[in-house]
Swiss-Prot record:
Family, per entry: Belongs to the EPSP synthase family. MurA subfamily.
Disulphide linkage map: none
Pfam families: EPSP_synthase (PF00275)
Upper classification of the organism: Bacteria, Bacillati, Bacillota, Clostridia, Eubacteriales
Organism: Clostridium perfringens (strain 13 / Type A)
Top EC category: transferase
Name of the protein this chain belongs to: UDP-N-acetylglucosamine 1-carboxyvinyltransferase 2
Gene: murA2
């Protein structure tokens, strides 16, 4: 099994370019099967394991998927041969549930095995099912698969009981070809929700209000292929911003939308780091001590849960006490035991992590327990004295393209073995 070996203690310096957003791409690719005419050419697609998995699922439906280069895919879904998405690829990733909305919209039926992803807590799809049923679908779950069908889909008002990115996107996809208008209330506002809406509109959909908590989708007769570029990855950018601060380095992160990073920038500034925004870049550097801060994860525009774990690593060597409250996922502190192996002083109480900063971490053999915990471990290795070995890095590969190569470009001593 592959692992990462890091010889820590070097400040990161230089510039790095951010890829397209994982969280947008993994919804856009399933949504591409809505196009009954023409082909979708999608660029700025991150070269990650989750995308490769989706490519295989789309091919299994009978679609033609051509890789034009490492970051560009051409998808022709004119002739889909099955409405069943089953098998190991479907089961092992959460984003496969977007095939439910896409197949339901286009064919009025689907069978999709229940997905997995990162082991960070219960990920129910009750809000998805509630929305599909409101549109007129009948849903059953049997033998680990969602079976769904409808004579027709009729637009309606859907109020989400909780803010859910997955449910917002899935219902947005499903409603594109419904009769009449669908209104999604208490919708998620994340940048990748907006990006999926923009992609749907590029195919001919009529989606308005994405980025607010009320989204209106007026159904159309058909969707067609289009050319589209995936939005830059807010989470990858945030991870490199945090790594720059943690190593007390000086890094310019390019191909970003600074507005999407404001909650992260605000916390870094509060700690004492310097953040300079350009039109499509952010520079992070440190020229003094960093102090502890308190933070609470929240739906966008709040502090993103997906960079909470890397932030925990940064705070582990900041002066004073910090408290992180995780409000999105109930089991997203698995990285803490790994950080403690490296000398961090952290106590978990329920959804809170109480961190007392130490002067330094020391290298150890640690495990990437999930995707973002893996990023936290990489940053921990970069700031530690000695050698760190990270195992289970298949989790990291799900969301960070060629992570060791990017950090090497910034001067890190990191190799994959």
């Amino acid at each position: 099994m592959n692992r990462l070996i890091i010889n820590g203690g070097k400040a990161l310096k230089g510039s790095i370019e951010i890829n397209g957003a994982k969280n947008a791409a993994v919804a856009i690719l399933p949504a591409a099967i809505l196009a009954s005419k023409g082909e979708c050419i999608i660029d700025n697609v991150p070269d990650i394991a989750d995308v490769h998995c989706l490519e295989r699922i789309i091919r299994s439906l009978g679609c033609n998927v051509e890789k034009l280069d490492n970051n560009t895919l051409k998808i022709n879904a004119e002739e889909i041969k099955t409405v069943e998405a089953c098998g190991n690829d479907v089961r092992k990733m959460r984003a496969s549930y977007y095939f439910i909305g896409a197949l339901l919209a286009r064919f009025k039926e689907a069978k999709v095995e229940l997905p997995g992803g990162c082991p960070i807590g219960v990920r129910p799809i009750d809000q998805h099912i509630k929305g599909f049923e409101a549109l007129g679908a009948k849903v059953s779950i049997e033998h680990g698969a969602v079976n769904i069908m409808a004579e027709k889909l009729i637009g309606t008002n859907i109020f989400f009981d909780v803010v859910s990115v997955g449910a917002t996107i899935n219902l947005m996809i499903a409603a594109t070809l419904a009769e009449g208008t669908t209104v999604l209330e208490n919708a998620a506002r994340e940048p990748h929700v907006v990006d999926v809406a923009n992609f749907l509109n590029a195919m001919g959909a009529n989606v308005k209000g994405a980025g607010t908590d009320v989204i209106r989708i007026k159904g159309v007769k058909e969707l067609k292929g289009c050319n589209y570029s995936v939005v830059p990855d807010q989470i990858e950018a945030g991870t490199f911003m945090i790594a720059a601060a943690a190593t007390r380095g000086d890094v310019t992160i390019q191909n970003v939308i600074p507005k999407h990073l404001e909650s992260i920038s605000a916390k870094l500034l509060e700690m004492g780091a310097k953040v300079e925004e350009g039109d499509d870049s952010v520079r992070v550097y440190v020229d003094g001590d960093l102090k502890g801060v308190n933070l609470k994860t929240a739906p966008y525009p709040g502090f993103p849960t997906d960079v909470q774990q890397p932030m925990c690593t940064l705070l582990s060597t900041a002066k004073g006490r910090s408290i992180i409250v995780e409000t999105i996922w109930e089991n997203r502190h698995k990285h803490v035991d790994e950080l403690k192996k490296m000398g961090a002083t952290i106590k978990v109480e329920g959804r809170s992590a109480i961190i007392d900063g130490v002067d330094r971490l020391t290298g150890a053999v640690v495990k990437a327990t999930d995707l973002r915990a893996g990023a936290a471990m990489v940053i921990a290795g970069l700031i530690s004295d000695g050698v760190t070995e990270i195992t289970s890095i298949e989790h990291i590969d799900r969301g960070y393209p060629h992570i060791e190569e990017k950090f090497r470009m910034l001067g890190a001593d990191i190799v994959r073995k």
